[in-house]
């Protein structure tokens, strides 16, 4: 066991969940000043997950932007897919980009997420100053539509 080990890390990730999404604060990076806690991990044998690796196949652009009868701004990618969205923004520190994902619209043409069975399927990106690019590091969804909740 080391006696004078000092490890530090920093990240903008505030919350990360496979189904619910990611909250990322870009003003917190790259701060490598948070002490790391060393602890005894599990002793169970790890088993490799079987199946295809998830990797990017192609990039798609938004096909249409529209406003729903409820007054929500929605981006339509023209097809249902599995993926993530990469943000390109020019913003001020503290500005927030808040997006929700859906596969279908309801019969009135409004944003619909009930089929996600409780998964939030959202990105919350807190901006730093200037031009920035970001995409989540763990989360991806099945979606066709993105609702812009805040920007």
Give the positions of each predicted feature.
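Extracellular/oxidizing-compartment recognition motifs
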Residues: 1-151
């Amino acid at each position: 066991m080391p006696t004078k080990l000092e490890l530090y890390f920093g990240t903008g990730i505030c919350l990360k969940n496979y189904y619910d999404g990611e909250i990322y604060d870009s003003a917190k990076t790259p701060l490598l000043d948070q002490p790391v806690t060393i602890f005894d991990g599990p002793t169970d044998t790890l088993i490799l997950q079987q199946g295809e690796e998830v990797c990017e196949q192609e990039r798609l652009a938004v096909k249409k932007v529209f406003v729903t009868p409820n007054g929500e701004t929605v981006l339509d990618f023209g097809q249902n897919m599995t993926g993530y969205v990469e943000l390109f923004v020019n913003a001020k520190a503290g500005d927030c980009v808040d997006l929700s994902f859906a596969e279908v619209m309801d019969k009135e043409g409004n944003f619909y997420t009930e089929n996600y069975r409780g998964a939030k399927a959202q990105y919350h990106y807190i901006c730093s100053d200037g031009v920035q690019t970001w995409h989540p590091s763990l989360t991806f969804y099945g979606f066709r539509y993105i609702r812009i909740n805040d920007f």
